[in-house]
């Protein structure tokens, strides 16, 4: 939580910033709120040196957060697993949301999955009460629907965070890919469907772009 001047708050009022290249294997963001800005950084790396310094650098150099009045730091790991054999229940309890390790590996988003797993949990709890059906069915449904799709999100995440500029140029900046991600956010498609559509289109382009980049590096550094 970052408290800034009224002028800075107004400047960010209708804008959302998601910026690559500042954090290794991750991104930085700024979201407007009623009386402050929600700012932060995230990374797919399990360990990174001087992580807080990257946040301070970002805030000190962005016009809408520079010389901020007050900063409240919060942070926690985002657990995710795409193992379709993960058990997230007993016969008396179920895990939902972050506790069930259903965070999107690509975006770090977890609110949707928290709500979705809670909805599915209620269904299976009611079946447990009314028909004495096993809550193992809850784990099975989460693994077959949500977690199996996060497997493909992880594929996108590994590619994007390893080659951010390349994947941005070939994918994000492309209107077709952009539209697919919009459909994903609206719940009109899944990561698996996106992967199956985009892989044959971009795998060859990505290989060619990678080879060109490798050739440039070779020419510059290897004599």
Predicted regions and their residues:
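Conserved FAD-binding catalytic core of PHBH/FMO-like flavoproteins
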Residues: 1-52, 56
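Generic structural "secondary-structure junction" signal
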Residues: 6, 18-22, 33, 39, ...
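Short, mixed-charge, low-aromatic patches
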Residues: 7-16, 73-80, 95-96, 139-140, ...
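Catalytic phosphate-donor-binding core of small-molecule kinases
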Residues: 10, 66, 149-150
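Mobile, glycine/GP-rich and aromatic-enriched active-site lid/loop segments adjacent to catalytic centers
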Residues: 22, 31-36, 63-66, 72-77, ...
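Short capping/connector residues at structural and topological boundaries
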Residues: 28, 42, 83, 108-111, ...
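FAD/FMN-dependent oxidoreductases across multiple families
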Residues: 47-125, 130, 136-137
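C-terminal helical "tail/cap" subdomain of flavin- and related membrane-associated enzymes
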Residues: 123-223
């Amino acid at each position: 939580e970052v408290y800034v001047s009224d002028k800075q708050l107004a400047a960010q009022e209708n804008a959302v910033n998601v910026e690559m290249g500042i954090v290794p294997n991750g991104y930085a963001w700024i979201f407007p709120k009623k009386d402050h800005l929600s700012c932060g950084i995230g990374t797919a790396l399990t360990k990174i040196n001087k992580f807080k310094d990257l946040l301070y650098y970002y805030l000190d150099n962005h016009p809408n957060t520079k010389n901020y009045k007050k900063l409240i730091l919060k942070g926690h790991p985002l657990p995710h697993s795409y193992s379709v054999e993960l058990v997230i229940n007993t016969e008396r309890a179920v895990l939902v949301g972050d506790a069930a390790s259903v965070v999107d590996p690509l975006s770090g988003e977890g609110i949707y999955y928290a709500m979705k797993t809670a909805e599915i949990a209620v269904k299976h709890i009611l079946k447990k009460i009314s028909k004495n059906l096993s809550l193992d069915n809850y784990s099975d449904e989460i693994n077959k629907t949500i977690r199996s799709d996060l497997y493909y999100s992880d594929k996108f995440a590994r590619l994007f965070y390893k080659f951010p500029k390349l994947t941005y140029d070939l994918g994000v900046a492309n209107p077709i890919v952009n539209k697919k991600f919009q459909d994903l956010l609206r719940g009109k498609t899944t990561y698996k469907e996106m992967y199956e559509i985009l892989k044959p289109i971009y795998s060859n382009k990505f290989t060619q772009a990678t080879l060109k980049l490798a050739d440039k590096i070779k020419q510059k550094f290897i004599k």
